[in-house]
Swiss-Prot record:
Example GO molecular function: rRNA binding
This protein's UniProt keywords: Ribonucleoprotein, Ribosomal protein, RNA-binding, rRNA-binding
Function of the protein: Binds to the 23S rRNA.
SUPFAM superfamilies for the chain: L9 N-domain-like, Ribosomal protein L9 C-domain
Gene: rplI
GO biological process: translation
Family note: Belongs to the bacterial ribosomal protein bL9 family.
Keyword field contains RNA-binding: yes
Coiled-coil stretches noted in the UniProt entry, renumbered to this chain: none
Keyword Lipoprotein: no
Source organism: Rickettsia bellii (strain OSU 85-389)
The protein's name: Large ribosomal subunit protein bL9
PROSITE patterns, A to Z: RIBOSOMAL_L9 (PS00651)
Length: 173
């Protein structure tokens, strides 16, 4: 199936590009999500006329997302959970929980689909999690999973000492 992208799609292309995709991918994902339209002759002509308008709209969205990314990148999300003696969680921390806590922290609705998490977090520690609000823009948040408030403070102190030891020392002349 040939489609014309009307929004940028990660790992596929930019606005206005024509791509040949699998029928299922086109029918079940690209078309229902309004990321693309079928590449008919009429649609090709329409997209040529509307491409500039679509790109301008995408630039506006990107600038808004950039502002939100600036808010997100400094966030530390803290989860206190029950664990076994070896630090394994009873349960896990998943992308839905991260999205909910991040939405509350920045006062902006963030879908769990925007949280890129390969596997659920199943043990205590500090994790970097990718947040992708736009196909071309992403940022990272710090997720801290601990069994108590005191353990969180230990992680934060540990992180500060790591930063101070990795920063280059000013040379005295």
């Amino acid at each position: 199936m040939e489609v014309i992208l009307i929004k940028p799609v990660r790992k596929l292309g930019k606005i206005g590009e024509i791509h040949k995709v699998a029928d299922g991918f086109g029918r079940n994902y690209l078309l229902p999500q309004k990321l693309a339209i079928r590449a008919t002759e009429l649609n090709k002509e329409l997209i040529v006329k509307q491409k500039h308008e679509l790109e301008e709209k995408d630039k506006q969205i990107k600038s808004e997302i950039t502002k939100i990314n600036d808010l997100i990148k400094d966030q530390k999300l803290i989860f206190v959970r029950q664990t076994s003696d070896d630090g394994k969680l009873f349960g896990s921390v998943n992308n839905k929980e991260i999205a909910k806590k991040l939405s509350q922290a920045v006062s902006y609705p963030i879908s769990h689909l925007n949280i890129i998490l390969d596997t659920q977090i199943k043990s205590t520690g500090i994790y970097k999690v990718e947040v992708r609000l736009h196909a071309e823009l992403s940022t990272e948040v710090t997720v801290i999973v601990a069994r108590s408030e005191s353990e969180i403070q230990d992680y934060l102190r540990e992180q500060k000492t790591e930063k101070s030891t990795t920063e280059p020392l000013a040379e005295s002349a």
